[in-house]
């Protein structure tokens, strides 16, 4: 009864132990820029998915001598597909059995993967998460750790699940315009992001608070009176200085803009392919319509001659209508464009004001 009640409560957050975060960061950084994947274990508690341990999947070594330039991409593709490979499924089961023997949470609650520059929304992510989420214990998540973003000083760890609408569409494998319009499925409905809470045990928290802090070796020069404090008033945040006008563009921002342009080009390529399909379909439908009109006229003539009418469904054998290409790739690319746009918007927030200030100083004054 408790399990049934817990499944009725939807997942609303993910709680990750700090040790698990360190394991994921270390595993992803060790294989960078090759994709790293692994399994996470834990338990579900009243809608909060508690992740208590993790372990990486075995990696595929690529020869460094006489290697092809595409070997790196091949290794990344193999690593990205690792969570659903048969060998790693067996490896995961054996690891969970060993964890159970040492009284560690042995419930698989998903998997993790590394990302570079926010580029993680692809078919591998969808297939891996669908592989985990379609199982009887579907309360699983995908943790995405952006190594390059974390190198800038802020941890980038996000949790995603496939939305129920997308799960139903992916099971049918029919991503046509008609089906997407019926289900009202858009690129925004592919993934559902859950908030992450980094958790420490009470024992570890107490230990951190009890750690001694090194005392300063030099005496601090405190002001002797309020008069000294007033004479040395620190500058306000808006105090004029040259550093605040620095327009240095983050290399991460430049690379993100380049990848955004590549994704936009891919979007136009997908759009041109779909428009080509529509033109082909229109031409074939025009031929079918003309053939039907001709056959109807022939049957009318044969009816006046008291002859048997000719079949009107022969067009299915004579003409072959083109098959509509899957719109899944276009949806994933649109979702990736949105991801890049959010990253660019976050980076340019602090630069836009400076650029407008420089522009106003460069333009001639208007009387």
Swiss-Prot record:
<comment type="similarity">
    <text>Belongs to the eIF-3 subunit H family.</text>
</comment>
<comment type="function">
    <text>Component of the eukaryotic translation initiation factor 3 (eIF-3) complex, which is involved in protein synthesis of a specialized repertoire of mRNAs and, together with other initiation factors, stimulates binding of mRNA and methionyl-tRNAi to the 40S ribosome. The eIF-3 complex specifically targets and initiates translation of a subset of mRNAs involved in cell proliferation.</text>
</comment>
<dbReference type="Pfam" id="PF01398">
    <property type="entry name" value="JAB"/>
</dbReference>
<keyword id="KW-0648">Protein biosynthesis</keyword>
<dbReference type="GO" id="GO:0003743">
    <property type="term" value="F:translation initiation factor activity"/>
</dbReference>
<dbReference type="GO" id="GO:0001732">
    <property type="term" value="P:formation of cytoplasmic translation initiation complex"/>
</dbReference>
<protein>
    <recommendedName>
        <fullName>Eukaryotic translation initiation factor 3 subunit H</fullName>
    </recommendedName>
</protein>
<comment type="subunit">
    <text>Component of the eukaryotic translation initiation factor 3 (eIF-3) complex.</text>
</comment>
<dbReference type="InterPro" id="IPR050242">
    <property type="entry name" value="JAMM_MPN+_peptidase_M67A"/>
</dbReference>
<keyword id="KW-0963">Cytoplasm</keyword>
<dbReference type="GO" id="GO:0033290">
    <property type="term" value="C:eukaryotic 48S preinitiation complex"/>
</dbReference>
<dbReference type="GO" id="GO:0005852">
    <property type="term" value="C:eukaryotic translation initiation factor 3 complex"/>
</dbReference>
<dbReference type="InterPro" id="IPR037518">
    <property type="entry name" value="MPN"/>
</dbReference>
<keyword id="KW-0396">Initiation factor</keyword>
<feature type="domain" description="MPN">
    <location>
        <begin position="14"/>
        <end position="166"/>
    </location>
</feature>
<dbReference type="InterPro" id="IPR027524">
    <property type="entry name" value="eIF3h"/>
</dbReference>
<dbReference type="InterPro" id="IPR000555">
    <property type="entry name" value="JAMM/MPN+_dom"/>
</dbReference>
<dbReference type="Pfam" id="PF19445">
    <property type="entry name" value="eIF3h_C"/>
</dbReference>
<dbReference type="GO" id="GO:0008237">
    <property type="term" value="F:metallopeptidase activity"/>
</dbReference>
<dbReference type="GO" id="GO:0016282">
    <property type="term" value="C:eukaryotic 43S preinitiation complex"/>
</dbReference>
<dbReference type="InterPro" id="IPR045810">
    <property type="entry name" value="eIF3h_C"/>
</dbReference>
């Amino acid at each position: 009864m408790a399990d049934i009640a817990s499944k009725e409560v939807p997942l609303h957050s993910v709680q990750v132990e700090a040790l698990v975060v360190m394991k994921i960061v270390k595993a992803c950084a060790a294989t960078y820029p090759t994709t790293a994947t692994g399994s996470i274990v834990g338990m579900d508690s009243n809608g909060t998915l508690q992740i208590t341990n993790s372990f990486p999947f075995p990696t595929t070594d690529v020869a460094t001598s006489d290697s092809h330039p595409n070997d790196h991409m091949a290794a990344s593709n193999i690593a990205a597909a690792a969570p659903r490979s048969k060998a790693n499924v067996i490896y995961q089961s054996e690891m969970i059995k060993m964890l159970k023997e040492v009284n560690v949470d042995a419930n698989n609650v998903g998997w993790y993967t590394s990302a570079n520059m926010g580029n993680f929304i692809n078919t591998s992510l969808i297939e891996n998460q669908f592989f985990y989420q379609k199982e009887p214990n579907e309360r699983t998540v995908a943790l995405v750790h952006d190594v390059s973003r974390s190198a800038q000083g802020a941890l980038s760890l996000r949790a995603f699940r496939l939305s129920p609408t997308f799960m139903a569409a992916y099971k049918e494998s029919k991503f046509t315009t008609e089906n997407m319009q019926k289900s009202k499925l858009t690129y925004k409905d592919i993934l559902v992001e859950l908030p992450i809470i980094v958790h420490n045990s009470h024992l570890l928290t107490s230990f951190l608070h009890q750690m001694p802090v090194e005392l300063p070796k030099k005496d601090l020069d405190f002001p002797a009176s309020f008069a000294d404090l007033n004479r040395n008033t620190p500058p306000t945040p808006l105090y004029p200085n040259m550093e605040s006008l620095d327009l240095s563009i983050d290399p991460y921002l430049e690379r993100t803009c380049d990848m955004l342009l590549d994704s936009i080009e891919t979007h136009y390529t997908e759009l041109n392919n779909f428009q080509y399909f529509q033109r082909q379909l229109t031409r074939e439908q025009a031929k079918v319509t003309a053939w039907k009109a001709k056959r109807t006229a022939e049957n009318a003539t044969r009816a006046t001659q008291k002859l048997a009418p000719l079949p009107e469904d022969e067009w299915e054998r004579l003409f072959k209508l083109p098959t509509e290409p899957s719109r899944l790739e276009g949806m994933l690319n649109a979702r990736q464009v949105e991801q890049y746009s959010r990253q660019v918007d976050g980076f340019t927030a602090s630069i836009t004001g400076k650029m407008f200030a420089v522009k106003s100083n460069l333009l001639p004054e208007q009387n």
